[in-house]
């Protein structure tokens, strides 16, 4: 399988451009190519394809504080991005798609850093029982992608201020708040 690393000499932190680049790469990925796209957004809540922004996010507060709201192609929950968060996207054709192998890249990177990470459920990667990486997926006719977050130094106060999570979901996870469920590396 061929591989590629897409980047820029200047880090682009525009949420709309980053999501557009992700879609462009998906549409132009060669058949035997695996692309790893690394990106960051600043002060942004990104919601899944079918989410209601007003149920997932305090949109008024986000807007008042100069934040931005964006919608991605994939499903999954709302996430908060700031410069303490690194985003990754694996783009590949459907025949070569291997979620476990892709997750192992992230888990292996954590091992190199001396951290024991583990997959939990379909779309989380945990350290010490707390999520530092949430993942989501999207496919079209020939290609698909798997993207996720890596929380390195996310502002947890801001994350908690903007994101709203149903009490039922928190109860199912056995935690009292979003902040108590997630962690920075």
Please identify what each model-predicted range represents.
Residues 54-77:
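Active-site cofactor/substrate anionic-group-binding motifs, chiefly glycine-
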